[in-house]
């Protein structure tokens, strides 16, 4: 990893995300028949990057519910590597550190004063999703983060613009996104980040 070479801290996140069922009762994090899949994905992540010094935090996944399958995944991960803290967005009861996604600046300022009784250390597990002309308040986040010793930063979503070049009939190059190829349905310009 270039992160090892240049000293960039990395949070490695298991490939578990299920927006469709998210945090409701239908979340795949609850049924017993999905437990092995949750544990396997978390352990595959850990085995792949355990020897990379840049990986300082493990993440059980993203936006996939609060169920017992994540407890099993956490237990397996800690048995394999107890040296790194584990986080899972919003589901702070089963992990080592607190997290939240896209908190408002007001929420951040309240958290700094102990208003919400959150688990520490704490980090913003997803923020700075630079859609269009966004992230003008990034300095406000960092003023809150740096105002205390229990906030430990945040994870930028996404680190890359996911659009791709396409060409007009006259050869003019432009950044294309959903719908530019006649594809339906699509997510429009959701990939135009940063």
Model-derived features: positions:
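Small-molecule pocket liners
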Residues: 194
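Substrate-binding/catalytic cleft of secreted carbohydrate-active enzymes
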Residues: 1-191
């Amino acid at each position: 990893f270039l992160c090892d070479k240049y000293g960039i801290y990395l949070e490695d996140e298991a490939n578990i995300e299920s927006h469709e069922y998210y945090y409701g009762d239908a979340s795949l994090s609850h049924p017993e028949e999905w437990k092995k899949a949750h544990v396997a994905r978390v352990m595959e992540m850990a085995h792949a990057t355990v020897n990379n010094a840049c990986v300082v935090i493990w993440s059980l996944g993203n936006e996939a519910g609060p169920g017992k399958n994540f407890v099993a995944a956490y237990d397996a991960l800690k048995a394999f590597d107890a040296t790194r803290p584990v986080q899972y967005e919003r589901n702070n009861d089963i992990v080592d550190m607190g997290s939240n996604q896209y908190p408002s600046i007001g929420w951040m300022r309240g958290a700094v004063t102990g208003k919400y009784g959150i688990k520490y250390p704490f980090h913003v597990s997803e923020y700075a999703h630079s859609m269009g002309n966004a992230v003008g308040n990034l300095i406000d986040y960092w003023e809150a983060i740096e105002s205390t010793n229990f906030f430990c930063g945040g994870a930028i979503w996404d680190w890359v613009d996911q659009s791709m070049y396409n060409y007009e009939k006259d050869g003019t190059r432009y950044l294309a996104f959903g719908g530019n190829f006649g594809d339906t349905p699509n997510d429009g310009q959701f990939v135009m980040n940063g």
